[in-house]
């Protein structure tokens, strides 16, 4: 069903059950499958495929050859109903793949608002991506990865399954992480990424003042430079968190870890 006739190229294939807002644009040779909902102002470029169940919000751009809402790349998947939900104002570039969830991972993959996913990015099943993130070319997220707001992942970088990447973190080009990355932390390019300080420049651009950045740097030194066991580091962070909401957020992230922390 459609509100009115959207701006659809005559070579595009739209399933009768798909619901497109009246101003949605669909380019040449694109496929919109069953149980797909696309919100107002969204543009689907040429040669894209969007499979359901998938819910897409407003003002998104799928540039070309993107494969969205496909079956999860998980051998345990047996055709059960799972879904993908994408928010508003995202830019999805060429050959990006975003898969639906799996029953074992909660049944849903989510992408928030105002994210940029550049060419050949892969977001696997059951991932949860926040808002205002930038994934450079060939970023790869394995299954069940959680990414906070304002995260930047450079080209050819990736995250192991079940990892969490905290808000405002930065993964350098080619960085690979097999552990949780605390908020604000930069990860370098090694065989397995290692912490390389605080993303100070990014924080300045987002309006963090000197006092906030100083508190975050102090927390980073406590966690990574002081040589403390994690238990002792968390005790010191708890004291620092009394005067810093940012440090409190770091500590809450660490306390919620279900796998190893990147150290």
From Swiss-Prot:
SUPFAM superfamilies: Trimeric LpxA-like enzymes. Keywords: Acyltransferase, Cytoplasm, Lipid A biosynthesis, Lipid biosynthesis, Lipid metabolism, Repeat, Transferase. One of its GO terms (molecular function) is acyl-[acyl-carrier-protein]-UDP-N-acetylglucosamine O-acyltransferase activity. InterPro entries: Acetyltransf_C, Acetyltransf_C_sf, Hexapep, Lipid_A_LpxA, Trimer_LpxA-like_sf. GO terms for biological process: lipid A biosynthetic process. Its main location: cytoplasm. It is found in: Cytoplasm. HAMAP family: LpxA. Homotrimer. This is Acyl-[acyl-carrier-protein]--UDP-N-acetylglucosamine O-acyltransferase.
